[in-house]
Curated annotation (Swiss-Prot):
Subcellular location: Cytoplasm
Gene that specifies this protein: rseA
Annotated function: An anti-sigma factor for extracytoplasmic function (ECF) sigma factor SigE. ECF sigma factors are held in an inactive form by an anti-sigma factor.
Required cofactor(s): Zn(2+)
Keywords, sorted A to Z: Cytoplasm, Metal-binding, Phosphoprotein, Transcription, Transcription regulation, Zinc
Subunit structure: Interacts with cognate ECF RNA polymerase sigma factor SigE under reducing conditions; this inhibits the interaction of SigE with the RNA polymerase catalytic core.
Keyword set includes Phosphoprotein: yes
Name of protein: Anti-sigma-E factor RseA
Taxonomic source organism: Mycobacterium tuberculosis (strain ATCC 25618 / H37Rv)
Length: 154
């Protein structure tokens, strides 16, 4: 049986041809928690999730640690926080009544899964023609629905 210490080396060498983001090039044992380098900045999604309080505790703590060391990411978090506050303080968003009416007419689909009286056929999606009729309402006269009707109608 192979020495457990050499397995990580063999694993890293076997995958050394992959880009660094896919294969770890560190000397840390395989399966060890990843240590982020100071050059790895937070992604836009991570910044938004941090500002919105949507990160899990471990991710939040890692992001907070990075923010304490990285002025660039800290500035981006400040910008995101200001944008969030500006949106919350802006006027209420109003939806046009015509759009609200169209959205309220979307047929409700039964829950997925076979019903008691079904013979094994698929009962997913709206009844035939309902989705096509809905698509017709949003077509912009010049065929703007991009061929979806041909895929919906069977």
């Amino acid at each position: 049986m192979a020495d457990p210490g050499s397995v990580g080396h063999v694993f890293r060498r076997a995958f050394s041809w992959l880009p660094a983001q896919f294969a770890s090039q560190s000397d840390a044992p395989v399966g060890a928690p990843r240590q982020f380098r100071s050059t790895e900045h937070l992604s836009i999604e991570a910044i938004a999730a941090f500002v919105d309080g949507e990160l899990r505790m471990n991710a939040h703590l890692r992001a907070a640690h990075h923010l304490s060391l990285c002025a660039q990411c800290a500035a981006e978090v400040d910008d995101q926080s200001r944008a969030r506050a500006a949106l919350r303080d802006s006027h209420p968003i109003r939806i046009p009544s015509t759009l609200l009416g169209l959205l309220s007419e979307i047929p409700r689909c039964p829950p997925e899964g076979p019903s008691k009286g079904s013979s094994g056929g698929s009962s997913q999606g709206p009844p035939d023609g309902a989705a096509a009729g809905f698509g017709d309402r949003f077509a912009d006269g010049d065929g703007g629905n991009r061929g979806r009707q041909s895929r919906v109608r069977r």
